[in-house]
Amino acid sequence: MWRVKDSIQESLLGIAELGLSKVVFRRVESQIDEPEESGVPESTVAEPAQVVSFSENGLRFMADITGGQKTGFFLDQRVNRQKVSEVSRGKHVLNAFCYTGAFSVYAFAGGAESVTSVDASKSAIDLCRQNVVANFASAPHNAEVADCFSYLTQIPDTFDVIVLDPPAFAKHQRAVQRAMRGYETINALALKKIKPGGTLATFSCSQLISREMFRDAIMRAAVSAGRFVRIVDFLHQAPCHPTSIFHPEGDYLKGLMLFVE
């Protein structure tokens, strides 16, 4: 795709309905090649703007498209955000690894009683606060800069709904076993903080972690936490991120919606 990026840019800018004034290309680090070995620059930007505003399903968001993670906003979670919204009415919600707070905004859109957003990045939390205020100015929103593992270990609070959407734990094959331990640990911590009858929406975006591996990690987490858990939905990347049948690794985003007793 990088070889034809100029053609892609020309085509996108030529679609009047999109109203684009610029195209930003970001090189995603590979599981195989290191950047210096690939001969491809880390990023190429056409007249970059740092923060852009846009809407998704009628909700307003801001994203840092040059300094943020990946493209600055995770469009692949669009459908899953709506599903979290649908279980949030009247609930106290924790959005862990919240990044810029898209799940938090959707939780309020679904009628959440309160939302707590936690991320280790201060710049992400700053945008998270702005995104919530842009849609629900007076909403009871608590945003904290913290390591999510430590936060879940230390807080006394419990929640009706918890969203776990961490960054990739395994970017290389040698990190898979450590990643599996990480998924088990963070999900066990979350399960201990969910009220009986609550919901956990948990994700892995590591393409090296299969759906079966992720499900096994969650099963072990449930045993460790001493919670009885039922799968109510299998979550995937949005249809705007189709997967070639010849490239199963493209089915990278996997998630579970769990009912926790």
Language-model-detected regions and their locations in the chain:
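S-adenosyl-L-methionine
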Residues: 123-163, 169
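Conserved class I S-adenosyl-L-methionine
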Residues: 90-99
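C-terminal catalytic and target-recognition region of SAM-dependent MTase-like enzymes
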Residues: 199-261
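Conserved SAM-binding loop of SAM-dependent methyltransferases across substrates and taxa
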Residues: 86, 100-113
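Helix-to-beta-strand junctions that scaffold the AdoMet/dcAdoMet cofactor pocket
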Residues: 137, 194-196
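Non-catalytic substrate-recognition/targeting regions of SAM-dependent transferases
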Residues: 4-74, 82
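Conserved SAM-binding motif I beta-strand of class I
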Residues: 114-119
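Mobile active-site "lid"/loop adjacent to the S-adenosyl-L-methionine
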Residues: 159-189
